[in-house]
Amino acid sequence: MRFQTAHTPNSLTEGPIAQTLIAFALPLFLGNLFQQLYNTADSLIVGNFLGSEALAAVSSSGNLIFLMVGLVNGISMGAGVVIARYFGAKDYDRMQKTIHTLLAFGLVAGALLTVIGMTLSPVMLRLMDTPETVLPNSISYFRTYFTGSLAFVLYNICMGILQAVGDSRHPLQYLIISSIVNIALDLLFVGVFHMGVGSAAAATAISQLVSMSLCMIRLMRSDRAYRVNLRKIRFDGRALREILQNGLPAGLQNSIISIANVVVQSNINQFGAAAMAGCGAHSRIEGFGFLPVTCFTMALTTFVSQNLGAKAYDRVKKGIRVGIFCSVTIAETIALLIFIFSPKLIGLFTSDAQSIAFGVMHERTTTPFFFLLAYSHCMAAIFRGAGKSTVPMLVMLLCWCIIRVAYVTFAVKFFPVLRTVSWAYPITWGLSTLVFTLYYFKSDWMHAFEKRERRA
């Protein structure tokens, strides 16, 4: 089969760097904004229609859900680096094999997640010290959410394929459609039919099925080199090794962060449903606020990977400087707005005064340090794009898992207040910033990539 192989429309290897990054990141931002909208719709609608305990049930499931899907999504992210590198090098045969191997992996992983999520949810939620008053709703939400695991995994894979070749416009369109579907179903199931917490998760699962279907149809009907043929979905040994080599560290990084956050959430749970609801509302706000930074780092990963594949090493260095500057500047601007309007923002999710007080305190402790979080994510994106995804995994393991867990385990014993738990985030963001900076300037990662490519 012959494909159109015009390179320029989706390539990040040409054109002014700042404009190229922004043009690619903007649809990513809008797409992720709508994704956050349908994630947040569950919390907003559940909190306002069903009360703070129902909101606590949704919030307590969040970190556990990310733990379950983080490994798979990280592997998909790492595979996107491989696809982007082959796209930059114009090696379309290897790109095709990588794409179809990744889809085969997604089918297996999605099925496994469904089984694990459905069967082990009560055990996992109890291990998190979820209060008994919240537990039934948490189990209902968690189990229903995981009925859509296959669609969720395949959508993220298909979206990653499109983004790896520089197409951030179509994923945006599909996310807008699925977000509208999700919010409409949330209002119908919870607001009109009063079907309970589980129906909010059902709305999310249905909307994910819609976005996955649209994304898959786009890939199957494409005449480009990244076209998907269902008959070619199978495992290729070399492609699978490359996917796991680049993706497994990224997946483990996601899981590492999630494990630490589950421990932090367990400590928050000990302060009761009001603390759970307030901090859960903050996590939704943080998800929105940090979106522009997340999208710049996603763009930076693809930019670095494509340009390294094209051997444009000077362009990589310039792109890194632009990406870090934009990300840090945006992060602190958003942090200031969240800090100022914190009570009103938390109040959107719950009218309970104690929940609002907990949420505002947590928010105003963490947001001033968003620049550290932004910088760390940029560094992780750079090394991931260079195929050195083990570096961010190890940094996150040390700073965001081991040290964070050790801190909350011991600090709360001596200072048993929620603010002590909140400080776990700024402290570990600062440590990861320090470690990443030392490695970036002291190691020879760029030349190591050149040598590896010459050997290949």
Show which residues each predicted segment covers.
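Transmembrane alpha-helix boundary and packing residues in multipass membrane permease domains
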Residues: 28, 32, 44, 48, ...
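Residue-level signal for short hydrophobic patches within transmembrane helices
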Residues: 14, 18-37, 41, 64-71, ...
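Short runs within selected transmembrane alpha-helices of multi-pass transporters and secretion channels
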Residues: 76, 144-163, 171-179, 200-215, ...
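Small-residue-rich hydrophobic transmembrane alpha-helices
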Residues: 55-115, 152-171, 265, 278-342, ...
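Short alpha-helical transmembrane segments in multi-pass integral membrane proteins
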Residues: 1-25, 83-150, 192-248, 304-369, ...
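Transmembrane helical elements of multi-pass membrane transporters/channels
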Residues: 23-42, 144, 155, 178, ...
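Small-residue hotspots at the loop-to-helix junctions and early N-terminal turns
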Residues: 52-63, 142, 201, 273-288, ...
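Helix-terminus/linker motif at the lipid-water interface of multi-pass membrane proteins
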Residues: 33, 37-56, 125-132, 188-195, ...
